[in-house]
Design a protein with these regions (language model features):
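Acidic/His-enriched low-complexity segments
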Residues: 2-418, 440, 445, 519-521, ...
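Hydrophobic alpha-helical and helix-loop surface patches within well-folded domains
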Residues: 240-242, 347, 379-559
Length: 559
């Protein structure tokens, strides 16, 4: 569309309409509108230089400027005009017919309009009469008019009884009995979990998390009952959820035990219950099984209520090859033989904790230990690296004592294990009582390691030990407040280092950290430290520099 200032100049012998408004041959449409507007197909257009007759020319004579018609019409966008030379005697497309009325719409126009109207009405009726549903990757999810929720489809085609990413609050876990048997030859594992749950609202379902697990059996037992009742289970992989359907209503205030048996493969990633390989002192390939559950990978090792607010106690049993060793959050209670060189390690019942803090390791490990206050501190590594754990042990003992005195709260567990893992993606993970590290952030060789290595190891240990109080003992309710965990641990990391190891000059590093936080926060990609998150992908994105660093500015003002 051309604006007034962009209108194309007409040839100099073409006459503007406003100059001849008195011409009687012209009908002013603004004053005498037609009853039926003409369609472009019904217009018989006479190619000429202007819509007005030129004075001095006969009715059937052609102005020389008509030769410019084609170019002028194209420039003015009049491609719809009829260019037939046989119709040039009609000098005005708007000239009224002899009977004084406008042309009627053609039959073709009436037919087209009728067809369009019929199609529009049909589409409206079709949409209105369709079953109420929402279209997703799984197809049409029908609406349950009783619950007024749109339920998705489970893998077996039945309606899954929960539609939200967050778990319902009608059932809460109290305790887990977890039995695992990893096989470092086949690189698979099998397991069973018994979850004691309490019912908050009457329900027929227990919805919890499961990811990549091959579930073979599910049963429910009432608190006073001794007979397991088979239960149907539905799976909805899109939300990593399963629903155990009770054979009868689950009553408010009652405890029930859900028993689930399953199997899976050890993960190829550094997430969940995963496997890694390394070369021993004889260059022989060995396998190592470890866990990394934060933020939402506990569900890939056992069915659970995998949200930080659902704290519970854990009794963990691990079956292993008698030549290997196992570690978990709590001290080992007993080891009993099973069969064919397989033994079972049972650990003491844990304190109430979130699922992302559960951890276990199965490998060939060696350690050195030291007692401090009421806790035994141990550092583990593969045998050929045992000579590099002394500095980590000494640093851990000093930091643990400092935090207990500073917080005036004793470390609540009887042991603290620090494990160097040959291949570990994160710098470290604060699992309660079993902190896992990358080898480069825990092992220190006095012959080859630098002062920079020593500062890094000290900082990482200080950070993870701070989490034993803030994050483990006290935990955020949901991942939008991850900054409470990581921001506090980051601040205490530098604070403790300056108090205990002033020769490392961590105050200079803290100043650099503050400037880094300001720089990150000035970018368009910055976000509030507390942001609404729902999906696993959104939760993962919360683990950025802002969650770790920005909040340290506020802590610095307070302290």
């Amino acid at each position: 569309v051309l604006s007034f200032s962009d209108q194309i100049q007409l040839p100099r012998n073409m006459i503007e309409n406003s100059m001849f408004e008195e011409e009687p041959d012209v009908v002013d449409l603004a004053k005498e509108p037609c009853l039926h507007p003409l369609e472009p197909d019904e217009v018989e257009y006479e190619p000429r230089s202007s819509r007005l007759l030129v004075r001095g020319l006969g009715e059937h004579e052609m102005d020389d400027d008509e030769e410019d018609y084609e170019s002028s019409a194209k420039l003015l966008g009049m491609s719809f005009m009829n260019r037939s030379s046989s119709l040039r005697n009609n000098m005005s497309v708007y000239r009224q017919s002899s009977n004084g009325s406008c042309s009627l719409p053609s039959t073709r126009t009436m037919v087209v309009c009728t067809v369009i109207l019929v199609i529009a009405v049909a589409l409206i009726m079709l949409i209105y009469l369709l079953p109420k549903c929402t279209f997703t990757k799984e197809g049409c999810h029908k609406k349950n008019h009783t619950m007024e929720l749109i339920y998705p489809l489970a893998t077996n085609g039945k309606l899954f009884p929960w539609a939200k990413i967050r778990l319902p609050s009608d059932v809460v876990p109290l305790h887990y009995d977890l039995v695992l048997q990893p096989n470092l030859t086949t690189l698979k594992f099998s397991g069973s979990v018994k979850i004691v749950v309490n019912i908050i609202q009457v329900t027929w379902k227990i919805v919890l998390h499961s990811s990549g697990l091959n579930i073979t059996k599910a049963t429910i037992t009432s608190a006073g009952g001794h007979q397991e009742k088979p239960a149907e289970f539905l799976e909805y992989p899109l939300h990593d959820q399963i629903a155990v359907m009770a054979p009868e209503a689950l009553l408010v205030g009652q405890n029930y035990t859900v028993n689930i048996e399953y199997s899976s493969n050890l993960s190829d990633t550094y997430y969940g219950f995963y496997k890694i390989s390394y070369k021993d002192e004889n260059s022989k390939q060995r396998w190592f099984a470890a866990t990394q559950f934060e933020p939402v990978a506990a569900r890939s090792a056992f069915p659970c209520f995998d949200e930080p607010a659902f704290k519970a106690t854990f009794l963990i049993k691990i079956k292993r090859d008698e030549k290997l060793s196992t570690l978990s959050n709590m001290p080992k209670k007993a080891t009993t033989p099973v069969a064919n060189g397989i033994v079972q390690d049972e650990f003491f019942v844990s304190l109430k904790m979130s699922t992302y803090l559960v951890a276990f390791v199965v490998a060939d490990l060696k350690n050195i230990s030291r007692q401090t206050n009421a806790s035994l501190v141990s550092v583990y590594a593969i045998p050929q690296h045992l000579n590099q754990v002394e500095y980590a042990l000494d640093t851990s003992v000093k930091l643990l004592e400092f935090y207990q005195n500073y917080f005036l709260i004793s470390y609540p567990l009887e042991k603290l294990d620090l494990v160097a893992i040959p291949d570990f993606q994160s710098g470290a993970m604060e699992n309660w009582g079993l902190i896992t590290f990358r080898e480069s952030t825990l092992l220190f060789d006095s012959n080859t390691s630098s002062a920079r290595d020593k500062k890094l190891i000290t900082a990482v240990i200080a950070h993870e030990l701070a989490h034993q109080w803030f994050g483990n003992l006290v935990t955020m309710e949901w991942w939008n407040d991850l900054w409470l965990n990581e921001g506090f641990a980051t601040f205490m990391e530098y604070f403790a280092m300056e108090e205990i190891f002033p020769e490392l000059h961590s105050d200079e590093d803290f100043l650099n950290l503050i400037f880094k936080a300001m720089m990150k926060d000035s970018l368009n990609s910055s976000h509030p430290v507390s942001s609404a998150v729902q999906s696993s992908e959104q939760i993962e994105e919360m683990f950025d520099a802002l969650s770790y660093i920005k909040v340290t500015l506020k802590y610095f003002e307070i302290f």
